[in-house]
């Protein structure tokens, strides 16, 4: 076949060379090169296949029969591509075809010249440049461009005279000088507008501001919170400190140090912490005011004074509880009792009640019912409140109360005083602790508990609540107006108003109806006036006065309108004012012709249009000015520029000043706490630690930073700084995020206080309180349990007898000599024991415990032996399963009418220990029927592309019902990448997250009911598998290998490889779906009269060989 194609290929090559050689080969600008092209040929090759035979062996499980393999070869055909070469002529680089010659090409057109070589122009006389387009370049001038220009700073040079044309910002003969500091621009003629010592750019006039200033002309100070060059530096001032706009130096409130971030150190206060505190006795000084916060027991401006008698504690705010003349300690409030008293507050008498004297042998002479106590030493009676006298048998005199009736009553306004408590019992109309306050307006009676019902300003009696009405009112609660025609107090006076005038119930003054006047409303309005009190003047032009009540003009004949000033009514014109005007936008209408006279800013026959953009005013005759920052042209009526928010000025070219924003800069910025205000909308850009529309709200708890976007990471109740997120720990915690307890031995705020616990006691890291170990007590656990007690908190009582001692921790009894036992309650005989020894009998180990432990050990050994036997059994069973056959379907490529060629799959998909079967003679045996449940497999794809299924136009529900099918391959089946996880035509091999291999493993397949007879080629027919869904009249082919499970030999489908593939010579077919979708077939599987001879149909069944155990031959592996 190869020899027959040689002359034909040579002839084709010669023709192609002749067609491509149209250029003149003698042209020196013609170049040639070789190009390659492909020709399809058909060639033969030796195709290996695996043949199976049986031998006798010692395999008991297979009845002493073993399967062996050998590799055989047969001749097969395949199509291939042969690469040919031919010479091709073309123009050399830089030339292009023009007829049969190659001419040079210039990328840029030669304006005044011609192209003589690639990208090379030959200019005409008098021109220069790469494209002959300019007389001289910018650096040369004069005849033949022979003189070099002397201009500097990008200045232009006159090509004729050589004079320099300076760029903006420069001047001088050669443009070597910059504009001075006050000018800029072309010829340095524009005046700089910079302020506050700013530098003006010599070209653009842009202002470079001095430190501390900003704005277009450096006219504004840096905004709050900024300072320095271009206001780019952020002020470090905290806690209300004010930053200098130039240096950034902080002016701090009193009590703050460097950058206002740290409070004054201990002992200092005031501005810049310059003053020294003067507090004594452990008082703490306020860092801002220097005011002393005194320690417990002291008071005064500098904490120099002890608490007054009767008070103690911090701020001397607590009252002493000491009684019976005891002295109170000003720091802790502890009581120092007088002789004869005891107790925490000295409230307990040493003598029993009713007794006194050094030996408590004398009886108190006091009245027991009225006496609080009897002095335990002197027997003096201390009377209860409300009683007095030597023996407490006299009541208090009027005006006195309390202990010994020494307190003076403070009751006023005739109130009674309670003899015991001194409480005032007020008379009706008064209240307060001393009855000095009269009942407030609206209340009356005892303790002012009753509410007055008086209305309309009536006065309520604080004693009985009776109402005194104001003028114009009457009734019990003064809620009724005076009857019509009456007025004054008690409604006793009569009104004198006429013509419907109203009478004021308070003063009787008349209020006249419109059109009347006078004290009694008995006079008409004068001519030319009308309305209430005749205060309004008639506004009539052509009228005979107006109505005295309404002011309506009485128009003369021939006039109309509200003021009688129009010939016709408003909006009408023509004969008898019978036509309506059609003018819009407040335009006036001519009464005789109806023509519209437009208002300023409008135009059109009916004034329906506003002025065109760019003009305004009367008849739209004025031109608008140039509005810089505006929504559009000027206002069509006024000609004013409508500035965008944030700008102002006649031309909208000025930014709103600091503190202003919005339309016409009419809004006032509300930003606080160093927030920056936008001149456009007034929105605030808040300083870190603040949020809100006006930056007035601090960050919510747990947030910090700009816009509070950061989340605090402080723990255990720590305070988080809203500015930088720094954690300030509560008592008992430390660390960057307050997650660490105080170190062992320390507690409290900042963990600076040392624990005082002893004897191994635990110290609370927050309060420092000691938790004692067993056997100890006391504030610092410094004391052992007292004799007779033991245990936690020393709350347990020892139970030892015979004067024995008890261990303060465990309560164990230490027996004295001669005693023994747990409680030392047994006589010890003659055995002398140490008084501190403690004996106990050892408990013998029971024999049943030893037996139980032995039985458990034996049981564990038996379980391990059974588990080992089970593992050995499973491994043996798996070894048997590896030799069972399975069936796999593989597509082939047609070569000719006698042979089929199996295409290769990627080597990575080869499975080890696979056994394959071939069908060299194709003996058809009895057809086998697959189990009925195989038809219900919900898949249309086989694993690893052993069988490709075309599902392109098949609905999912219909796929399950189709049984007969032929496999197809995509056109690019040779590309290994398409066989990874996709089936034919890109159909995914996975279904609901499972691969087909996993799904097939889980299906309950069973072995075929067919029997396989032992012969040289014992083939059996296998029915076409139900996974093929598209109907066809012809079939593919299959190849078989061993499965993974012995009990379902046809259940699992594995990948194949070129090394061990065995192909059945069955014709490839094209599915009905592929035929519809691929009319222009160019792939290796297209059918044509040459590929498919007559009578090439093969039935839809496949042959099966028995299994074998031999491995593939080395020849197959190398293949």
UniProtKB/Swiss-Prot annotation:
Keywords: Cell adhesion, Cell membrane, Disulfide bond, EGF-like domain, Glycoprotein, Laminin EGF-like domain, Membrane, Myogenesis, Phagocytosis, Repeat, Signal, Transmembrane, Transmembrane helix. It is a single-pass type I membrane protein. GO terms for cellular component: plasma membrane. It is found in: Cell membrane. Residues 27-104 form the EMI domain. SMART domains: EGF (SM00181), EGF_Lam (SM00180). Disulfide bonds join 31-92, 57-66, 91-102, 102-115, 106-121, 123-132, 145-157, 151-164, 166-175, 188-200, 194-207, 209-218, 231-243, 237-250, 252-260, 277-285, 279-292, 294-303, 316-328, 322-335, 337-346, 405-417, 411-424, 426-435, 448-460, 454-467, 469-478, 491-503, 497-510, 512-521, 577-589, 583-596, 598-607, 620-634, 624-641, 643-652, 669-677, 671-684, 686-695, 712-720, 714-727, 729-738, 751-763, 757-770, 772-781, 798-806, 800-813, 815-824. The keyword NADP does not apply. Residues 98-133, 141-176, 184-219, 227-261, 274-304, 312-347, 401-436, 444-479, 487-522, 573-608, 616-653, 666-696, 709-739, 747-782, 795-825 form the EGF-like domain. Membrane receptor involved in phagocytosis by macrophages and astrocytes of apoptotic cells. Essential factor in the regulation of muscle development including myogenesis. Likely plays a key role in muscle cell proliferation, adhesion and motility. May control the balance between skeletal muscle satellite cells proliferation and differentiation through regulation of the notch signaling pathway. This is Multiple epidermal growth factor-like domains protein 10. It comes from Danio rerio. The gene is megf10.
